[in-house]
């Protein structure tokens, strides 16, 4: 079951990284709105949480 969770975490990380890249592409063209900055920060925090979870899963394996 841990393998399933690792796959889920990886998929979510991929999606979040894609969204972060898109944020930086848009930012190169214009200033982000306060809502876009907040979403960026929320994604960044979620990425940190997911990496911590992955570390825990790998240590438990």
Positions of predicted regions on the chain:
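Short, charge/polar-rich alpha-helical segments
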Residues: 1-14
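Short, charge-rich amphipathic interface segments used for partner binding and complex assembly
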Residues: 11, 15, 21-60
């Amino acid at each position: 079951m841990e393998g399933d969770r690792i796959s889920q975490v990886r998929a979510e990380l991929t999606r979040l990284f894609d969204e972060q890249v898109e944020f930086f592409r848009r930012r190169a063209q214009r200033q982000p709105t306060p809502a876009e900055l907040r979403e960026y920060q929320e994604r960044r925090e979620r990425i940190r949480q997911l990496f911590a979870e992955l570390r825990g899963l790998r240590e438990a394996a």
